[in-house]
Each structure stands twice: as structure tokens, then as C-alpha cells.
Curated annotation (Swiss-Prot):
Gene from which this protein is expressed: panD
Domain of life: Bacteria
Cofactor: pyruvate
GO biological process: alanine biosynthetic process; pantothenate biosynthetic process
Annotated pathway: Cofactor biosynthesis; (R)-pantothenate biosynthesis; beta-alanine from L-aspartate: step 1/1
Function according to Swiss-Prot or TrEMBL: Catalyzes the pyruvoyl-dependent decarboxylation of aspartate to produce beta-alanine.
UniProt keyword Endoplasmic reticulum present: no
Pyruvic acid (Ser) modified-residue sites: S25
EC numbers on record: 4.1.1.11
SUPFAM superfamilies, sorted: ADC-like
Lineage of producing organism: Bacteria, Pseudomonadati, Pseudomonadota, Gammaproteobacteria, Enterobacterales
Disulfide bonds: none
Name listed for the protein in its UniProt record: Aspartate 1-decarboxylase
Reported modifications of this chain: Is synthesized initially as an inactive proenzyme, which is activated by self-cleavage at a specific serine bond to produce a beta-subunit with a hydroxyl group at its C-terminus and an alpha-subunit with a pyruvoyl group at its N-terminus.
Broadest EC class assigned to this enzyme: lyase
Length: 126
């Protein structure tokens, strides 16, 4: 059996730009991409915490150290500057590998400062 697993996640990054007329994509600070193990041109899913919209695009490298999160092209209709996003990429693998898989998760504050890195999402308590 093949499973699709979370590969990397940027948790609660803030949109710094939204450019309807830029070639479609999402520009992400290179430091953020590396922290989550997301490659340039990799497919990503974006979950807008602010407005509830969910959409797919691909990652492009933003200037290293700039803290840029720029939603571009048609996707700019789905996010405004200041919106809080979760950006995720996924990987497929055999069931045996998936059972011990650990994603790369980067957590951010409201100013796109990376606060911590983790290899799991915490267990949700009741």
C-alpha cells in the first residue's frame, strides 16, 4: 500500500505580498523552504487560516532572510496581505516507511519569525 504523508509544513506564516499579475506561484523565503524541506517548484497546498480558503500552487524561492510570503497569480484572490497561512507539502511512500515517517514542521509567530522546528505535530488533547 502507498500512503500520502505530510512532508513539510510552515505553520502560521503571514502573507507579506499578494500579486495578481505576477506569474502564478507562492514566493517563500529560502530559509523557510529549507526549514520545511520544501523544494522550489514543488507542489504545495495552502490553507488560509484567516478566511478558510484552501488552494494549491507551487513554491518559488523568495529572497533569503526577507520573511517573504507572496501569493501570486490567480491565487492572490485567495489571500490578502496580513492573512495567516499554513503551507504544506506531501510525499508518497510505502506503508512500512510511512509508519516511522517524521515530517519537517516550522512554527512561526505573527511577524514571520521562526519560533521552532519539529518532526511531528503535537497530539491534540480533548
Amino acid at each position: 500500500m502507498i500512503r500520502t504523508m505530510l512532508q513539510g509544513k510552515l505553520h502560521r506564516v503571514k502573507v507579506t505580498q499578494a500579486d495578481l499579475h505576477y506569474e502564478g506561484s507562492c514566493a517563500i523565503d529560502q530559509d523557510f523552504l529549507e526549514a520545511a524541506g520544501i523544494l522550489e517548484y514543488e507542489a504545495i497546498d495552502i490553507y488560509n487560516v484567516t478566511n478558510g480558503k484552501r488552494f494549491s500552487t507551487y513554491a518559488i524561492a523568495g529572497e533569503r532572510g526577507s520573511k517573504i510570503i507572496s501569493v501570486n497569480g490567480a491565487a492572490a484572490h485567495c489571500a490578502d496581505v496580513g492573512d495567516i497561512l499554513i503551507i504544506a507539502s506531501y510525499v508518497t511512500m510505502p506503508d512500512e516507511q510511512a509508519r516511522s515517517w517524521q515530517p519537517k514542521v516550522a512554527y512561526f509567530d505573527g511577524d514571520n519569525e521562526m519560533k521552532r522546528l519539529a518532526k511531528a505535530v503535537p497530539v491534540q488533547v480533548a
